[in-house]
Regions:
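Surface-exposed, glycine/proline- and aromatic-rich loop segments on solvent-exposed faces
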Residues: 479, 483-529
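CE4/NodB-like, metal-dependent polysaccharide N-deacetylase domain
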Residues: 152-193, 281-300
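Short, surface-exposed basic-aromatic patches at helix termini and helix-loop junctions that form
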Residues: 122, 181-182, 198-213, 315-328
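Surface-exposed loop and adjacent secondary-structure segments within mature catalytic domains
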Residues: 145-150, 198-201, 205-262
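Long amphipathic alpha-helical scaffold segments
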Residues: 88, 99-111, 120, 125-127, ...
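Short, well-structured secondary-structure segments
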Residues: 1-170, 187-191, 210-217, 335
Length: 529
């Protein structure tokens, strides 16, 4: 974005409200209320706009929606400044100039993200880590059978996925991009979803990554010891220290309870009370430690997900926590690399293959949809290897390879299966299969027809069941004879709306026949039978 890139959200937001077409309005209605309830409650005018029936929206309402979505996602400190403070107070009647100010503020902040973090890192105030480039579950890219260590009885994909060179390339690409942004190589790496394993540990070390991190349950399985009795940490001596993985880098393991308190619990408390609770728990860990024992408490959580659920974006919590940390004599904040410079890690002979979710990979592999996606990916990756054997590593190969590495990202597999639901799984599914099709096209191959078949199995929601037997006239009209029919509305996310052929399916029967009627969105082209 800082270099001028755009996406549909930005394009539709920037478009003059008077020029919005039906597709744009469908997109705005589907996407521009994508905020938490906590955020929505801060802005009554935004909430009122959400409650207003879409078919009564005026051009001004659509412009207000364009503005409100982007206004709501600005930081509270920014919203306290003019002109945004006045805009929030006004609540409605925004102009195109108002909208431009909000969008320009977003762009200005985006351009400052990397320079700000680079300055803070150069001052030694923070350490910026990175993640394998397309956020893959690295052990599964290295070898999908790595899932069996934690899931010995799992049903895995028919075709074993093994691309150790791709796993290494994800690490290399992340390192190269980091150097471009920060002027030096990264020292630390957070593997996607905290996914680690003994087989991939050497990759990090060989690519000069000095430390990685994961969850306490991965440590418990690695050392074969229980760390907690219920929720009470019984082995702080094991958790509160870094380890040196055999043939790999150092590794830190997060305190899951304290991290999850920040991520999921403290948003329900006042910021000061939450900070006091965390500081009290940290002090309890300090007082329980033997004298001269330098214990390290590692807190790791999704940095982008928690704060939108705090009443004030977490401001009060942060200010109170940082004040407590800087004024207390018993605790010191430290970057991972600085800690390792003064403390020798404990040897770890074997690193368990697992993630920070259940210490396994079940979120990304093992269910039917997930396994099917892996099989389709493996088929495309095998086709790419065949292409390389015939044509070498030419420009088309490199482009197709990059596309398939993007398809190796964890988020595609996250949304497959029953364990996660975005509400837009069909869109992610279509995009994933689209990547595979694009790779086949670059290789000069016709994409397999199976890629036209959705992986996501959507349960059909019946909006109305048949009320009575019916024998409608077959005249192409949905008249009174169809009022007793069952009805199934067309479904699909915003990506499908422009492609939708019919609005709903009506169905019913009498003693001799079943009747179907499609309510088309536009005049259909007659089919040749």
């Amino acid at each position: 974005y800082g270099k001028g890139a755009t996406d549909r959200a930005y394009i539709v937001a920037q478009k003059p409200a008077v020029a919005l077409d039906a597709s744009d309005k469908d997109y705005l209605a589907a996407k521009f209320f994508d905020v938490t309830e906590v955020m929505l409650k801060r802005f009554p005018a935004y909430a009122a706009l959400k409650a207003k029936p879409r078919n009564t929206y005026t051009t001004q309402d659509w412009r207000d929606l364009q503005v409100w979505f982007n206004l709501a996602w600005l930081d509270p400190d920014v919203l306290a400044q003019e002109p945004f403070r006045e805009m929030v107070k006004r609540g409605r009647g925004f102009s195109e100039n108002d909208k431009a100010r909000v969008l320009n503020q977003h762009l200005a902040m985006l351009k400052e993200i990397v320079p700000l973090h680079r300055r803070l890192q150069e001052k030694g105030l923070i350490e910026v880590s990175t993640t394998p480039y397309f956020h893959p579950i690295l052990p599964l890219i290295h070898d999908s059978d790595s899932a069996r260590e934690a899931m010995p009885g799992a049903s895995l994909p028919l075709a074993r996925f093994q691309q150790p060179d791709d796993a290494r390339r994800h690490v290399q690409m992340a390192t190269e991009y980091y150097k471009e942004l920060f002027g030096r190589a990264p020292r630390g790496m957070w593997p996607g979803e905290g996914s680690v394993g003994q087989a991939v540990a050497p990759i990090f070390k060989e690519e000069r990554i000095t430390w990685i991190a994961s969850d306490e349950e991965v440590l418990a399985n690695s050392v074969g010891s229980t760390l907690r009795q219920g929720e009470k940490l019984s082995r702080p001596d094991l958790l509160y220290r870094p380890y040196q993985v055999k043939d790999g880098p150092a590794i830190f393991f997060r305190d899951r309870r304290l991290s999850d308190d920040i991520g999921f619990q403290y948003s329900k408390m006042s910021g000061k009370a939450a900070a006091a609770d965390l500081l009290a728990k940290l002090k309890q860990a300090w007082t329980a430690a033997p004298a001269n024992d330098s214990r390290l408490v590692t807190l790791i959580l999704d940095g982008e997900n928690a704060w939108e659920n705090y009443p004030d974006d977490g401001k009060e919590f942060f200010h109170a926590l940082y004040k407590g940390l800087t004024t207390s004599s018993w605790v010191k904040t430290v970057t991972p690399s600085a800690y390792l410079a003064g403390q020798k890690p404990t040897p770890l002979p074997h690193l368990w293959a697992g993630s920070w979710i259940g210490a396994d990979f079940s979120t990304w592999i093992g269910e039917g949809e997930e396994n099917r996606a892996w099989d389709l990916l493996e088929g495309a990756r095998t086709a790419l290897d065949r292409y390389r054997m015939r044509h070498g590593m030419n420009a088309k190969y490199e482009k197709a390879h990059r596309i398939l590495m993007a398809a190796e990202g964890s988020d595609w597999f996250w949304w497959y299966g029953k364990d996660q639901n975005s509400g837009r799984d069909e869109e992610f599914d279509e995009a994933f299969r689209g990547l595979l099709k694009e790779a086949y096209a670059l290789m000069g191959e016709t994409p397999p027809q199976v890629l036209d078949v959705p992986i996501v199995q959507v349960a059909i929601a019946v909006d109305q069941t048949p009320k009575a037997l019916l024998t409608p006239p077959l005249d192409g009209k949905l008249g009174e004879a169809w009022e007793a029919a069952g009805r199934i509305a067309a479904t699909g996310g915003a990506m499908a709306q422009g492609k939708r052929v019919f609005e709903d399916l009506r169905y019913g029967w009498d003693d001799t026949a079943v009747y179907l009627a499609f309510a088309y969105t536009k005049q259909p082209v007659p089919m040749e039978l």
